[in-house]
A protein has these predicted regions:
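Post-signal peptide N-terminal segment of mature Sec-exported envelope proteins
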Residues: 23-45
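Exposed low-complexity, polar/acidic, P/S/T/G-rich flexible segments that act as propeptides
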Residues: 72-77, 133-154
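An anionic, turn-rich surface loop/hairpin at beta-sheet edges
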Residues: 87-117
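Noncatalytic modules at the cell exterior or secretory-pathway interfaces
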Residues: 50-57, 116-133
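Bacterial signal peptide processing site
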Residues: 16-19
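C-terminal motif of bacterial Sec signal peptides marking the signal peptidase cleavage site
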Residues: 11-14
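Contiguous beta-strand segments within globular domains
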Residues: 41-59, 67-68
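Short acidic/polar inter-strand loop motif in beta-rich domains
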Residues: 61-64, 109-112, 119, 130-141
Length: 154
């Protein structure tokens, strides 16, 4: 009987499901600013095509960012080339001018979900446009990134 328990303990760990990892990719923005005519493009990385995921945009900025909000247009492009366009408004500072994101020194980071409960075929590519009214070149942003993580519940 003890031999059966020991054998089961050795075999069962081999049946464990490998954990699905989160992935992130960050793009460093030019020090001269992000031009509104130049979108950023991301190709999300997925570990398991049968799971559903959450996509989150993260932005890092410094004290030279001159606005309270960051307005973005996010195109989520599916495998069949269908485009799901959404507007994203990231509130980077409160009404008193205090930065809302986490960070240290002169850099701050804030992340907001842009898609939840999607399959890999629903989001093959993500294109992000900055749409700040009256602003062709946006200064003070250092990086923009896409974080892909599996949803907790299927």
């Amino acid at each position: 009987m003890t031999m059966i328990i020991v054998a089961a303990m050795l075999i069962l760990p081999g049946c464990e499901h490998k954990p699905v990892m989160s992935h992130a990719r960050f793009v460093h923005l030019p020090s001269m600013g992000w031009l509104s005519s130049l979108p950023l493009s991301f190709e999300p990385e997925y570990d398991d095509s049968t799971r559903v995921y959450e996509l989150t945009l993260a932005v890092r900025h410094d004290n030279s960012f001159a606005y309270r909000n960051l307005s973005l247009v996010v195109d989520v492009i599916a495998a069949d080339s269908t485009i799901n366009r959404r507007s994203v408004n990231m509130v980077l500072a409160d009404e008193f001018g205090n930065w809302t994101g986490g960070g240290f020194g002169a850099l701050y980071q804030l992340a907001v979900p842009v898609a939840k409960g999607i399959t890999p075929s629903q989001a093959r590519r993500i294109v992000v446009w900055q749409t700040m009214a009256g602003c062709d070149t946006l200064h003070g942003l250092t990086t923009l990134g896409l974080v892909v993580k599996p949803c907790d519940k299927q």
